Regions:
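Residue-level signal for inorganic ion chemistry
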Residues: 4, 40, 89, 109, ...
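Short glycine/serine/threonine-rich phosphate/pyrophosphate-binding segments
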Residues: 6-11, 34-35, 96-103, 114-115, ...
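Active-site-proximal loop->helix
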Residues: 10-19, 38-39, 120-135, 151-154
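Short acidic-hydrophobic, aromatic-tinged amphipathic segments that line or gate anion-handling sites
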Residues: 49-51, 69-76
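Rossmann-fold NAD(P)-binding glycine/threonine-rich loop
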Residues: 59-62, 95-108, 115-137
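Beta-loop-alpha module in the N-terminal Rossmann-like domain of NAD(P)-dependent dehydrogenases
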Residues: 72-104
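Conserved anion/nucleotide-ligand pocket segment
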Residues: 147-210
């Protein structure tokens, strides 16, 4: 879910590198129709979803005759992630749009590679309660969460008192405070270290990304 975003593209790179380990069953994108079409033709999933209905016809026409089923809307994603042939769901959608389908994946006892931190910000208590009564397992794959997870493997949590979350330094880190009153959106989108989507780049510049994490 979120195949055309940064983490989605990286996930597909891994799937392409290890075809003996991974079969792509479903691709979900919001509005990036051209890239979704390209991904679908390359990986040949059973289903693709373009959440934005205005792009449905373009995707459907491009994939006509391929045997790939094309859907639109958000509700269908919850149905598709729960299908029996799916064993792992990568949730890399931006914002809260991944919440309903993550809940559906938990109910269906899927393994979940979670990059969508907003899901836990909004509904962490609900998600954690559901995990207790499900065979579903949640793996953090967003950068800091994944690093914390790997650092804690084999550790006794009783011996861990603090985790320190660092920041790589956005475009305003060394800027004089008085300059901040006149910065523009374009300034905020010029991250010095990473090429990311617009929303996460803005969130990084404002430090909101760290607050969510």
């Amino acid at each position: 879910m979120g195949s055309t975003g940064s983490i989605g593209r990286q996930t597909l790179d891994i799937a392409a590198e290890y075809p003996q380990l991974f079969e792509v069953d479903l691709l979900v994108a919001n509005r990036s129709a051209d890239l979704l079409i390209e991904q679908a033709l390359r990986f040949k999933p059973r289903n693709v979803v373009i959440a934005s209905s205005e792009h449905y016809d373009k995707v459907a026409q491009a994939l006509e005759g391929t045997g790939i089923a094309v859907h639109t809307g958000d509700s269908v994603v919850s149905e598709l992630v729960a299908q029996p042939q799916v064993d792992t769901v990568v949730t890399a959608m931006v914002g809260y749009s991944g919440l309903a389908s993550t809940i559906a994946a938990i109910k269906a006892s899927k393994k979940i590679a979670l990059a969508n931190k907003e899901t836990l910000v909004v509904a962490g208590e609900l998600i954690n309660e559901m995990l207790k009564s499900s065979r579903s397992v949640l793996y953090p794959v967003d950068s800091e969460h994944g690093a914390f997870y790997q650092c804690l493997v084999g550790e006794d949590m009783a011996n861990v008192s603090k985790l320190i979350l660092t920041a790589s330094g956005g475009p305003f880190r060394t800027m004089p405070r008085e300059r901040l009153a006149t910065v523009t959106k374009d300034d905020a989108l010029r991250h010095p270290n990473w090429a990311m989507g617009a929303k996460i780049t803005i969130d990084s510049a404002t430090m909101m990304n760290k607050a969510l994490r």
